[in-house]
């Protein structure tokens, strides 16, 4: 599954992501460089195969559902104009 060039934590990240999806997340989220939760639909489908997408192959900043919810609360929501 992992070759020597891969992140050695890639399988563990995928296992953790599967748990977070079972706990209520609709998508796998990583922390981006701006400190925001960034969804990754590609990783969401790959974690059930024990993998992450190429973009996140070296990113260990997987966010739990609690962290995603907390970041959503801290980020001001746009008000829709009616």
Curated annotation (Swiss-Prot):
GO terms for biological process: symbiont-mediated suppression of host gene expression; symbiont-mediated suppression of host innate immune response. InterPro entries: Acc_prot_5b_avian_CoV (IPR008458). Involved in host translation shutoff without degradating host RNA. By suppressing host gene expression, facilitates the evasion from host type I interferon immune response. This is Host translation inhibitor 5b. Keywords: Eukaryotic host gene expression shutoff by virus, Host gene expression shutoff by virus, Host-virus interaction, Inhibition of host innate immune response by virus, Interferon antiviral system evasion, Viral immunoevasion. It comes from the Viruses. It comes from Avian infectious bronchitis virus (strain Beaudette). Changing residue 81 to S: In strain: Isolate Vero cell-adapted and Isolate Vero cell-adapted p65. The keyword RNA-binding does not apply.
């Amino acid at each position: 599954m992992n070759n020597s060039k891969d992140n050695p934590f890639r399988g563990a990240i995928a296992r953790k992501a599967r748990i977070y999806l079972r706990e209520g997340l609709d998508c796998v989220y990583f922390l981006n460089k701006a400190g925001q939760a960034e969804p990754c639909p590609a990783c969401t489908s790959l974690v059930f195969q024990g993998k992450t997408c190429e973009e996140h192959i070296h990113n260990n900043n997987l966010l739990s559902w609690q962290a995603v919810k907390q970041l959503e609360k801290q980020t001001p929501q746009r008000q829709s104009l009616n």
